[in-house]
Design a protein with these regions (language model features):
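Short, mixed-charge, low-aromatic patches
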Residues: 18-22, 43-46
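A short, surface-exposed loop/turn module that caps and links secondary-structure elements
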Residues: 31-56
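Enriched for short, Lys/Arg-rich terminal
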Residues: 1-6, 10-13, 17, 24, ...
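Compact soluble domain cores
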Residues: 21-35
Length: 93
């Protein structure tokens, strides 16, 4: 079963500010994750149902939340990994 993709309002604004090539890379990975969103190696510790997608070469991260009851994946935050800022922002949302 495939999940639907949703964005938190703040995350959508961050998404729109991304360079087109970064968006395409994330989009490709998100399509894979909609089919299988719970990837154990990508689970965020201390945050139930939250996972990350990493673009190592660019240093960007995308944090998303899986809601099984509604069959949706919600993008919580998108940003550079610098000093784990994207993870801190996601923790506040």
């Amino acid at each position: 079963m495939t999940y639907e993709l949703h964005f938190k309002e703040e995350a959508l604004a961050e998404w729109r500010r991304l360079d087109g090539s970064l968006r395409e890379q994330f989009k490709k990975k998100l399509i894979e994750r909609l089919a299988q969103p719970r990837v154990l190696s990508a689970k965020l510790s201390g945050h139930p149902d939250r996972y990350k997608i990493k673009l190592r070469s660019a240093g960007y991260r995308l944090v998303y939340e899986v809601r099984d009851g509604e069959l949706i994946v919600v993008v919580v935050a998108v940003g550079r990994r610098d000093r784990n800022l994207v993870y801190q922002v996601a923790g506040r949302r």
